[in-house]
Structure formats: structure tokens, C-alpha cells
Amino acid sequence: MSHKITVQKGTNIERKCFYYEENTEKPILAAGVLFIKEENGKKYVLMQKVIEKDKPNQYSDFGGKIDLKDDIIVDTISRELGEELNWGLYEKVKKKNIYLDATEKLKNLILENIVKLIYQGTAKYFVVIAKIPKNIFFDFDKIGEFEKLDKINRTIHWISYDEFIKLYNGIPNQIHPRLWGNQILRFFTPHKFGFSKSS
């Protein structure tokens, strides 16, 4: 995936930008992942609910802005995922080689289980939807209800596809704006767009 480095307008801050499908008209400034699973015939998506005053009960994927050090888009996603889970899935410790090992495990978890890639043009955001393997367990007690790095109050939840759509269609919309769009809706409500439920 090609990229360029730009300087943010009015500042000296450099930002890296990737391009979706090598198209310079489809810049990516941030990226994230939505994990899905099926249990007892019902489909679920893993989301974090932010409970800060300015974003009450807003549901989001796991992701964030591209760093200058990111060589590929999955570098961004795996780093943000690790930070937002407080490294509660694969533990990060101070030894550099262990940290890299944890990051590589997250990269592999994402890359080996991709279901769909979505480019959100309005938000300049790239979303990976990945099916979580049955042997991967999210320990919510270990992950906690507070993101340590950015000091954000949040909780982690598996919610059903139906609940996702209910939150999306609510007033106000409780899904993070970077996830708004028809491609996301088509994925979570395929039957309403002429697709089978397995698509």
C-alpha cells in the first residue's frame, strides 16, 4: 500500500497517509478492526463503549490514526488494538522483544481471519472485519473498564448484529461516525440489501 507524508495545515505536525487500492483519491488517515463471531446461531461484533462526558455511550471499533512509524496499515490497527485492550489479549511487557511478539500476534490474528475490507471515504478510514477464532478468549476483567494510555473510560462488549443496527438507527446514532456508511450497513443487515445472511 503506497503512502505519503504531509504536514498538517497550520502546524509543523507530519502525518502519514496510506492509499486504498493505490488510489490517490482514496486516502487513509486512520484504520481499525471489528471482530465478529457466531455463537448458537447468532452473530456478534466486538465493540468498545466510550462513557466520557463528550461521547456518552458511543460504540466504536478498535482503531486510530496512522503513525509515521507504521509501514503497513495492519501496523496501525494492531498497535491501536493492543493499546485499547490494555494489552489484555497478548500481554505487552517492558522487554522490547516481548512487545514486538505481542504486536506480531495481533497482526497475525487480524491478517489470518479477514472477512471483509471496507474503505470509509468520508472519514478517510479503513476498516478490517475479522472473524475471531474459537480458541481466542477476551478476558474483559483483565482488559478492564479504563484505557490506560489515553485515560478513557470505556467498556468492551460483544453485541448482536441486531443490536448494532438498533444503535446505528437510534436518535442519536450511538455508533462512532467513522463507521457510518452503506458498506457497514450492508454487512450487518445483508438480508435488507438482497444478500443472504451468510454473506
Predicted regions located by residue number:
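Extracellular structured ligand-interaction cores
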Residues: 28-32, 63, 125-127, 153
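Active-site donor-binding loop signature of nucleotide-sugar glycosyltransferases
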Residues: 50, 63-64, 161-163
